Amino acid sequence: MAKQSMIARDVKRAKLADKFYAKREELKKIIYDINSSDEDRWAAVLKLQMLPRDSSPSRQRSRCRQTGRPHGVLSKFGLSRIKVREAAMRGEIPGLKKASW
């Protein structure tokens, strides 16, 4: 089980990313627009840098929904590889079965 503080930190980052999503996209649109002036682009870069660091979506970590484990998380299920295997062996994931060839 992951530390509760680490899980809470990721939840906080997700909330911040949702809160600042529109503003970040608006600023990035100005920055990547070829037709905008250099002054506007530079001002947008400075404003983007002033936003909270944790509001960037790349700061989020995918974690297992059951255990909070940060590594080996299968995004299709939202679970770590260990919990996916356990659930598959119990038959809790429809259509998923152990491979054999």
From Swiss-Prot:
**Which Gene3D superfamilies does the entry link to?**
1.10.287.1480
Q: Record's superkingdom?
A: Bacteria
State the UniProt keywords alphabetically: Ribonucleoprotein, Ribosomal protein, RNA-binding, rRNA-binding
Cellular-component GO terms for this entry: cytoplasm; small ribosomal subunit
Segments passing through the bilayer: none
* Biological process per Gene Ontology, one example term: translation
GO MF annotation terms: rRNA binding; structural constituent of ribosome
Function in brief: Binds 16S rRNA, required for the assembly of 30S particles and may also be responsible for determining the conformation of the 16S rRNA at the A site.
Q: What PANTHER family does the entry give?
A: 30S RIBOSOMAL PROTEIN S14 (PTHR19836), SMALL RIBOSOMAL SUBUNIT PROTEIN US14M (PTHR19836:SF19)
Family membership, please give it: Belongs to the universal ribosomal protein uS14 family.
Return the HAMAP family for the record: Ribosomal_uS14_1
Q: How does it assemble?
A: Part of the 30S ribosomal subunit. Contacts proteins S3 and S10.
Q: What is this protein called?
A: Small ribosomal subunit protein uS14
